[in-house]
Amino acid sequence: MHKIISLIVLVILLNGCGGGGGSSPSQLTPIPAQENNSSETLDPNTDIFIPKETFETPEYRNQWGLDFINASDAYSYGASGKGVVVGVVDEALDWGHHEFLKENILHPDSVLTYSGNREPTPLEKFHGTATSSIIAGRKDNEPVDRNMHGVAYDAQILFIAIELGSPPSDGEYEPIDIPAFSWERFDEQESKFYEELSSKSDVINNSFGFTGQITDYSRETLQNTFPKLINTFASQQETIFVWSAGNYNGITDTEGEQVNAANPGILAGLGYYFPELAKNNVAVVAVDQEGEIADFSNRCGVAADFCIAAPGVRVPLAIPNNLFNSLSENEKSNFNDNVLDYLENHPTEAYLLGSGTSFSAPHVTGSIAVLKELFRDNLSSVQILERLFVTANKTGKYADKEIYGQGLLDLKKASSPVGSTLFYTRSSIYSEALPSKSSNIFLTKSFGDGLKNSLGKTKLSIFDALGAPFSVPVSSFVRSNISSSKTMERLFNFKEKKYGYISSQGFEFYSSWKRFLNSTGAEVNKIDFAEINFRRKDTLLSFAYGKNPSSNFLDTSEELLIHQSFYDKEAFLNPWLNLVEEGYSLGFSNRLNALYFDLNIFSGFKRSEDWFLKPNYYFQKTKNESKGFNLSLRNNILSKFMIGYTLGFLETNNGLFHNRFNGAFNIIEDTKSIFSSISFKSSLVKELNFIGSINYSNSSNINSDKIIKNISGLEEFSFDFALIKKSLFYKNDFLSFRIKQDPRIEKARVSLNIPKGRNPNGVVEFQSLTLPITPSGREINFETSWSFHRDNSKSFINLSFIDDKDHIKTKDIEINLIFAHQRFF
């Protein structure tokens, strides 16, 4: 296999940043045994793929840093670093450790030995094993003592072993004297090394550094010393370089003074002098379990703009297998007595606790790998790092940029939408945006579940305030716009008062009033409809408010018969003309030999469910205004068998009937529909009537320039039949049997242009879909009613059976019973 070989000169000057400043585990402590007796109840979130609690296993909780950065929230979105290559430049790796026993976890170009093919000692494998386990230790849920997993547990590690020197102890700290050495070879080779490593890695973890702070040197010194390396870091914009800030705060220098490490180390802080590096380089400081900056950790200081805080104190991590048995007496001196005693008593121990910015940096590296998978091909590395900074916790103490820089790492916020989510219906995220909150589709009963079923699990992208895409089901924006007050409407109809007056000059006046409680709780009379007719021989001219225009097809006596039998204003009328109920209609009727000709012109709005709270004749205009006309031809309305045919035209502004398409789903084109009805009434025997209607509509293609591009071939159908027997038990009682189907889409297609993410340049990508719309069920409503009318009282009983309610297939039959009685005093 091809290997990348790091030829680092002056290796003794590069020190690991774990264990208090070096690769030795002097700040490592044994892990005390813990029991997890918690039993949490899952609280599924429908906006994510899997409830986050699913990921909060004992393995997850054994590494407190995971919960501290809210890693499970990112996992719930389906991101775990899969497909992401993480470069790890570190001392050495125990690749046989339990945390790395996973197929393909190691990139084939990994280099696990030193120059000359020397095998690192178990102690030399300590630091790299620890950092790698935090980044990408495998998730296996096996009952291994102290088992844990990494932040990006599905990422692949490209490990490069380098030899690191030991960090200075108290009294030995001294910033490296850069002018005292020749750096040309180092600069040349490290530049090539990182250039090649960057070509194969999405993010590179560097838990090491020189002694000294970035502010100990001038820009000119660093520019002259590392020109090629700096240029490489700047040119590799698609790779993020993560650096440990250093562990030198509070250490004693050679002058006996305590070091105030107010700024990160040289490599971690290069972005201060070279701003172009701040876009893809990040320095990481360490915090403890309380979220406080670690005493030993360098601060962000001058690197605040590209510095972040992450867990780095007593972090659970993996160590080489059987470490104690491999240690020489000299190597044992690197451990404090507590750790050494623990390892001696647990010689096979494979986990310890470690402190250092070496272990905070891998939390950031792993988080970037998770975000890289989540936003792969959508956001560039620079954009991901910017997102990590913007979403970091900046509240309270984390607002102190001198210490915490951009704040505390928060993977939940980084993987979740920032601010209000938006839709882009054009080709760029820099074009006009539409809020997703106000983008929705409200469908009437005729659609049933047809659109939702066709959409299935189809997803689209919404974008947050930072331009990041999030995939959500299209169906989540589809809602029902079905009246919930049918029963209450019948009760109101039962209580309504009708008035009529016929003058000798041919004028007829009719009105209906309903009594409601208004918004203040007071009872008010609200006009339901009003009608003025002028009748002259075979000619009728009518003007009405609040009525379905197709009701002109009925004689006054027939209207009364239907009203008293069902208390349903929509019975046997054209269902689409309810769209102009809150409006006016003008009708003309004339006899043509043996036939009658009717013409109606109408305009109005669909009456809202709270219409009775508005003042009389108050129109709450919406964008869905409808207007049109219809022509009817029928035989004598008073004959024993009446049949008629109606043909009409209906135009609805900015929408489709009473369906509402808002925001990114907006339809701005008017809907033009042709509707037809066959209506009939037959007097079978005395006081026994058979009445019914069959209705059909066909709508023109509707086009839009947003997500819904076209709705075509829309056909709807409905029917309503009833048998009514008058004076069965009493003179003024009515027994009826009725079967009906409300309008249902029989055929339609919808064409969509769905946003499916973006590229790093902000170009929104779309997917075109054309789907049929067919409800899964067909609602059939069978009902029987009995009503009785006296001078001082009236009663009404209605029993209904509804199969496939709302045109949605179901095994259940809904049964409703209405009983109403009113007495007049």
Predicted features by range, described:
Residues 13-16:
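C-terminal motif of bacterial Sec signal peptides marking the signal peptidase cleavage site
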Residues 22-26, 80-81, 138, 142, ...:
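Substrate-binding/access-modulating region of protease and related hydrolase catalytic domains
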Residues 63, 70, 201-205, 373-489:
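C-terminal subdomain of the subtilisin-like protease fold in secreted/lumenal serine endopeptidases
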Residues 530-534, 586-590, 631-635, 676-682, ...:
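Residues on the lipid-exposed face of transmembrane beta-strands in outer-membrane beta-barrel proteins
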Residues 554-556, 561-578, 598, 614-623, ...:
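Outer membrane beta-barrel transmembrane domains
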